[in-house]
Design a protein with these regions (language model features):
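Substrate-binding surface in catalytic domains of secreted glycosidases
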Residues: 1-79
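Active-site rim elements
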Residues: 17-20, 104-111, 132-133
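Extracytoplasmic/secreted envelope proteins and their assembly/folding machinery
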Residues: 23-31, 116-120, 143-146, 150
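Beta-sheet entry/capping signal
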Residues: 42-44, 129-132
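Glycan-binding loop/region signatures in secreted carbohydrate-active enzymes
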Residues: 44-122, 148-156
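Acidic carboxylate-rich catalytic motifs and surrounding loops in phosphoryl-/glycosyl-chemistry enzymes
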Residues: 48-49, 134-136
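Conserved, well-ordered alpha-helix/loop/beta-strand core segments that scaffold catalytic motifs
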Residues: 122-130
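Acidic-and-aromatic substrate-binding clefts and catalytic sites of carbohydrate-active enzymes
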Residues: 136-142
Length: 156
C-alpha cells in the first residue's frame, strides 16, 4: 500500500499510475524493478479488494492529498453500507478511483472494476508474471472484482 495506517495525508493506496501529487505507483515500482534487472515475467502487479479510509479530511480537492488521520479498512461488502454517503471520483493520472464523504469528512481509496481491468491489461501488455489480489474474502460473491480480473484476462 502506498497510503495507509501510517500516512498523515490522503492518497491512492493502490494506483496503477503516478498521480499529480506523488510518484509512488505500480508502474513506477515495476519500472524500478526492471531497471534493477528483474525480468517482467518475475513481477506480479497487485490489486486491493479492500478500501482504506481516512477521517478528518478537509473538503479540498475532494479530499485527495489532504492532511488526515488514518481510519479503518472496509471490505467490498461492508463498504456498501456507507457507500451512499460518498461522491466517487476517478483520477486519470493515477488510473485510480477514490471517494469523498464531505459531510463526515472521510476519504476512501480502493480499487474498482475499472482499475482492476486496467491493471490486468497492463500485466498482459507488459508480459508481467501475473496479477494478484488481497484478499478474496473481501470481494462480493456476485459481479465482484475477481470476476472483472478474470474477464479482463480472458478478453486479452
Amino acid at each position: 500500500d502506498f497510503y495507509g495506517s501510517g500516512s498523515s495525508k490522503t492518497g491512492h493506496h493502490t494506483p496503477l499510475g503516478s498521480d499529480r501529487f506523488k510518484e509512488g505507483s505500480a508502474v513506477s515500482s515495476i519500472q524500478a524493478l526492471m531497471n534493477l534487472g528483474v525480468k517482467p515475467e518475475k513481477i506480479i502487479i497487485g490489486a486491493a479488494f479492500y478500501i482504506k479510509t481516512f477521517k478528518e479530511v478537509e473538503n479540498i480537492n475532494n479530499g485527495l492529498d489532504q492532511n488526515a488521520v488514518s481510519s479503518r479498512s472496509y471490505n467490498q461488502i461492508n463498504f456498501e453500507e456507507v457507500r451512499s454517503d460518498f461522491n466517487f471520483h476517478w483520477d486519470a493520472s493515477a488510473n485510480a478511483p477514490y471517494a469523498y464523504d464531505s459531510i463526515n469528512k472521510i476519504f476512501a481509496t480502493f480499487d474498482d472494476h475499472k482499475s482492476i481491468q486496467l491493471k490486468s491489461q497492463y500485466a498482459l501488455e507488459h508480459n508481467l508474471g501475473g496479477i494478484m489480489f488481497w484478499q478474496l474474502m473481501n470481494d462480493k460473491k456476485q459481479n465482484g472484482l475477481l470476476k472483472t480480473m478474470v474477464d479482463a484476462i480472458k478478453e486479452n
